[in-house]
Amino acid sequence: MVGSKMAASIRERQTVALKRMLNFNVPHVKNSPGEPVWKVLIYDRFGQDIISPLLSVKELRDMGITLHLLLHSDRDPIRDVPAVYFVMPTEENIDRLCQDLRNQLYESYYLNFISAISRSKLEDIANAALAANAVTQVAKVFDQYLNFITLEEDMFVLCNQNKELVSYRAINRPDITDTEMETVMDTIVDSLFCFFVTLGAVPIIRCSRGTAAEMVAVKLDKKLRENLRDARNSLFTGDPLGTGQFSFQRPLLVLVDRNIDLATPLHHTWTYQALVHDVLDFHLNRVNLEESTGVENSPTGARPKRKNKKSYDLTPVDKFWQKHKGSPFPEVAESVQQELESYRAQEDEVKRLKSIMGLEGEDEGAISMLSDNTAKLTSAVSSLPELLEKKRLIDLHTNVATAVLEHIKARKLDVYFEYEEKIMSKTTLDKSLLDVISDPDAGTPEDKMRLFLIYYISAQQAPSEVDLEQYKKALTDAGCNLSPLQYIKQWKAFAKMASTPASYGNTTTKPMGLLSRVMNTGSQFVMEGVKNLVLKQQNLPVTRILDNLMEMKSNPETDDYRYFDPKMLRSNDSSVPRNKSPFQEAIVFVVGGGNYIEYQNLVDYIKGKQGKHILYGCSEIFNATQFIKQLSQLGQK
């Protein structure tokens, strides 16, 4: 977690819970003597998405998992091996599970449900086990409460499968029925409940009024309250994971609605992780690259040509990624270059020592040199695995950063980033918006649309009809689809009635001149023409709201936020206790989808706060392309 390591992070907790489950629900002891029990793991797509960012195939093998298979794939019987199931308790999954029992596929069955299973479905399994004469083989049935995906020490999303169900579009559809909305809210609340069970803490909840976030808050408060009231079955007594409580103070949960800030998800970004997510295929911590054939013959402004797929996992053990995922891109390019140079120096040293070791000659100088170098070579050889790992990471980040750089150069993303920052901070613009939209060399139609929407959202005063027509013509001429603008117009009119538009603070990005080091001809990265923009910390709306509530600051933006304490006997919306001290731990959850720009902004904000922790969560994580698609669908209604 960002801040001091006072408590187990959510990644640690979910990993511990998964390892315990794979160990037949007995706490997993590291370095325990003897071989692990060999077993098969059967999961559905939900289970796969939860496990894959946390446990590698090697870690699964170390836990005794010889085979991991999808529940709905064709599976042969392996009758002398126990099977650990990790699935959602859906109708279709339960049917398949019962079929497995009837077909007597495995020696024994350890059934783990990602989310709590209902009594009626449990009875279906019991009946199937009876009919198949397999009651004794069903060894354990567990509700795991793990229905969320952890992507970072301090970041989680609700789901990846069926995410359309909880998407921004689903929540904001004008024709959504009350029943459909209930289903969406219940899905979100179920996952958040699982999150807090895994965290082992009951939060204080704050949320804005009259939004989907408020509906989530009311339902979550009720669900936590009911669980706490049932003392015998409460999931919050004791610490089942034995990893030490979150901390003595309860965490704050801030539920915000995506509608408080629609500009940030459309923003062109400048930090490494957010750029990778924006321009590449980055999904559950894995980036899929198509090896480029270069951009020679493509017209300027077009995306580079592509071929050959390759995928890389960007994991917590990747030191370079952990250190630089929040860095501005030119800094990343420079660091890759430095790593490469230091690796080459180490490699040359090993080669030099090897050649010295092959020295002929009997003279004493050579002999003493030999003994001196033996020690050096021994140390060099022992650091060889480390060297090879370093090489692997350098190659990985060279490929990923090069792919990002191709997009930056082909689409002039540095220009977009700088221009949007100026719009959002109300700084004087050095070039008219129409010029940027009309420039055939700058960006794709989608880049232009993103820029215009940010301008439209951030403007205190909407442009006049005459001006708007002019912009629309320029956008259409540039090949843009205007559906997203249709929706944003309606949204802005509605938001204006509800409240004032979000302000983005007065940020500036300072161009620092081009990077001298990366500009060297020996560099992997030809950064020519790319601005070396340096970021100044500014709080985005979500960070500002969190800051107000975490530090108990009085601010018109958050003063009317509702307050829920599920541990209080009466559930009236009591006003905030006056004598509250600031919170040390907080979870910000965005109903309607989040992004890596917001996540990075929170990480940067908390760096300056000693001993405080923040977690960022969202119903889904989307990049600007995916978000524009949702806005477009809403605009076509």
Curated annotation (Swiss-Prot):
Which tissues carry this protein? Highly expressed in testis. Detected at lower levels in brain, astrocytes, heart and small intestine.
Name the source organism: Rattus norvegicus
Q: Which residues carry this modification: Phosphoserine?
A: 32, 298, 523
Which molecular function terms from Gene Ontology are attached? Answer: protein-containing complex binding; syntaxin binding
State the protein's purpose.
Plays a role in SNARE-pin assembly and Golgi-to-ER retrograde transport via its interaction with COG4. Involved in vesicular transport between the endoplasmic reticulum and the Golgi.
- Gene Ontology cellular component terms for the protein in this record: cis-Golgi network; endoplasmic reticulum membrane; Golgi cisterna membrane; Golgi membrane; Golgi-associated vesicle
**What membrane topology does this protein have?**
Peripheral membrane protein
- Assembly with partners or alone: Interacts with STX17. Interacts with the COG complex via COG4. Interacts with STX5A.
Q: Which InterPro entries match?
A: Sec-1-like_dom1 (IPR043154), Sec-1-like_dom3a (IPR043127), Sec1-like (IPR001619), Sec1-like_dom2 (IPR027482), Sec1-like_sf (IPR036045)
Q: Which keywords does the record carry?
A: Cytoplasm, Endoplasmic reticulum, ER-Golgi transport, Golgi apparatus, Membrane, Phosphoprotein, Protein transport, Transport
> Per its record, how is this protein called by name?
Sec1 family domain-containing protein 1
Disulfide-bonded cysteines: none
Which PANTHER family does this UniProt record tie to the protein?
A: VESICLE PROTEIN SORTING-ASSOCIATED (PTHR11679)
User: Which Gene Ontology terms describe the biological processes this protein takes part in?
Assistant: endoplasmic reticulum to Golgi vesicle-mediated transport; intracellular protein transport; negative regulation of autophagosome assembly; post-Golgi vesicle-mediated transport; regulation of ER to Golgi vesicle-mediated transport; regulation of protein transport; response to hypoxia; response to toxic substance
Compartments (UniProt record): Cytoplasm; Endoplasmic reticulum membrane; Golgi apparatus, Golgi stack membrane
Do you know what upregulates this one?
Up-regulated in astrocytes upon reoxygenation after hypoxia.
Which family is it part of? Belongs to the STXBP/unc-18/SEC1 family.
